[in-house]
């Protein structure tokens, strides 16, 4: 599966002049090597990290933590934020703060925190759990899941220590235009790159 993606990664690297991250099906340091040589700037792992936390260490030691994003899909179950794998289909035994601390200890460079409860709803990011996670570790946290308005981005950056915010549907369906969001956030004093 991974090797079918190599042509796509190479094509993106040739045609896009911004850093990009590749994930899905990455199980070994060799997979990472192939993707980085193909042009990926960073890689992201999720299920394979949970199933084999030493993979985080192996990747970090061989390629540097700066290229490793550990993606963490979470859902609130009976008041506890649990970690899920396999595209959100399978609950793990990990509570989110416990897992991100393990990921950081093993060498994760960043955490991509996706609230499955909020994903696609456009009702705003999960601010409380994002803040709890960001305060529990010393690596960057990217919030994901729920963005619906420009103010949602302002809120996640002012009420949490999240260093980034990921959104998809609001951009795909032109609910928010990226230049407008940048203008809004800049005018509110949020530093952007």
Name these PLM-found stretches.
Residues 24, 45-48, 168:
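Short beta->alpha connector loops at strand-helix junctions that form conserved
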Residues 10, 33-36, 57, 61, ...:
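Alpha-helical segments flanking ligand/cofactor-binding loops in enzyme cores
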Residues 1-2:
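Short, small-residue-biased leader/transition segments that mark boundaries at the very start
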Residues 20-21, 26-39, 128-165:
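Catalytic cores of alpha/beta
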Residues 15-22, 65-69, 80-87, 136-144:
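Short beta-strand/loop segments at the ligand-binding rim of alpha/beta enzyme cores
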């Amino acid at each position: 599966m991974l090797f079918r993606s190599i042509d796509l990664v190479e094509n993106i690297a040739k045609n896009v002049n911004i850093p990009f991250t590749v994930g899905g099906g990455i199980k070994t340091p060799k997979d990472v090597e192939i993707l980085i040589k193909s042009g990926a700037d960073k890689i992201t792992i999720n299920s394979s990290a949970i199933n084999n936390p030493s993979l985080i260490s192996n990747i970090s030691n061989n390629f540097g933590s700066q290229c490793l994003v550990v993606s963490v899909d979470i859902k609130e179950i009976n008041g506890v934020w649990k970690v899920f794998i396999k595209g959100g289909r399978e609950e793990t035994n990990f509570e989110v703060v416990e897992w991100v601390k393990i990921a950081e200890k093993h060498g994760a460079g960043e955490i991509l925190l996706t609230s499955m409860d909020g994903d696609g709803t456009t009702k705003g990011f999960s601010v409380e759990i994002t803040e709890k996670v960001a305060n529990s570790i010393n690596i960057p946290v990217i919030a994901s899941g729920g963005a619906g308005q420009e103010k949602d981005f302002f809120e996640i950056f002012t009420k949490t220590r999240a260093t980034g915010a990921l959104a998809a549907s609001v951009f795909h369906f032109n609910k928010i235009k990226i230049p407008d969001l940048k203008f809004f956030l800049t005018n509110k004093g949020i530093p952007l790159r």
